[in-house]
Amino acid sequence: MLHTASRGCSRSWLRRLTALIAVSALAFVALPNVAVAANPMEYLDVSFGGTFAEDTYTTGGDEVARGSVTKHGSIPTKLDGGGITLAGGTNGVTFTSTASFSASGKVNKGFRAEMEYRTKQTPSNLATLFSAMGNIFVRANGSNLEYGFSTNPSGSTWNDYTKSVTLPSNNVKHIIQLTYLPGADGAASTLQLKVDGVAGETATSAAGELAAVSDSVGNKFGIGYEVNPASGAASRGLAGDVFRARVADSDAPWEILDASQLLHVNFNGTFSGTSYT
């Protein structure tokens, strides 16, 4: 009798388990589709460990270039340990992304860009550290580093929205980090800049204005080079060393950090024993 009761108990337990599995399966099938946020895209991340063949750069190691990297003028000189030296003037590097950042003559997709560089002498006036689509720029202007963008809302009237910080010193590596955010639904567009982790003022457009795109450079970025095709812009290259350049989605995390940024702690976390989180 004890043996028979045990068998009955086992069958009852098995029926309950089978029913539970069936209910769980139905519940899983009935779940609504849940949107999963896509990871931020990285379009360019190079330290110039690859090679230039003629005008085109071939990435090396784990470098990223979702598009083409091209030199203008002379072939950049490679530095021991990574990086290149740009001669300035009409020389520089451009990145043409396979992703679209513009439509109808406007930069309608935001992005982040980072560059680690060093100058050995004060840059010439309007020498360009970074540019995008022809009317987004970071450049020397006298004793200042000027950054901003130009808009052309009416098709005939140009508006410039710029801010500036003190020009970084020579013979020292510096990191610039910028974020362009196009205004949505009639809002203002913005360009934010940090130099070695210190943020400058935000360049902000009038409501509804987006950075303008110059002819044929809708998805083009300049590294130590001005991509604007106007004849006066062709000689605005930066003379200096570029160690790394990166372009990513506007919500991507920063990747190029100096010691001061890595060690920044405001102690809003917690201690567990001797460890801080």
What do the predicted segments below correspond to?
Residues P40-Y43, F52, G89-G148, A184-G186, ...:
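Extracellular glycan-recognition modules
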